[in-house]
Amino acid sequence: QHTDVALPHYKPEVWTFPRGALCTIDRSWLWPIGPYLFHGIAETHVSHHISSKIPHYNAWEATEALKVKLGEHYKYCDENVFVSLWKNSRACKFIDENDKVAFYRNVHGVPSAVVANGSKDDNSDSGVNLSD
């Protein structure tokens, strides 16, 4: 939920609660077993980060509302959770601590995504380009 090639990391000087709360991803987790056993926490994880006081039985409705509100900024992965785990364990080794907004890099130092806008000194997460 907290580690994915599409999720940025923020240095303290640019971190805000909304940015931090949205640095997670909803995943389909062992459908239909996961939602039943774990009350949908994997499938509604973004709404849990927005407000952890939302009861699990209302998290599905909250997630649907967030999808509408966040639009393209809502992160969801319906890939098999074990495939995602394997891919992310290979692609997400470290982040570059020199960037205010950083994305995971693989073992060769190749970033999973780059910030498309802004200079090296003042980068922003708007305009993110994901690499293959």
Question: For each predicted feature, which ranges?
Answer:
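Hydrophobic transmembrane helical bundles of multi-pass organellar membrane proteins
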Residues: 1-132
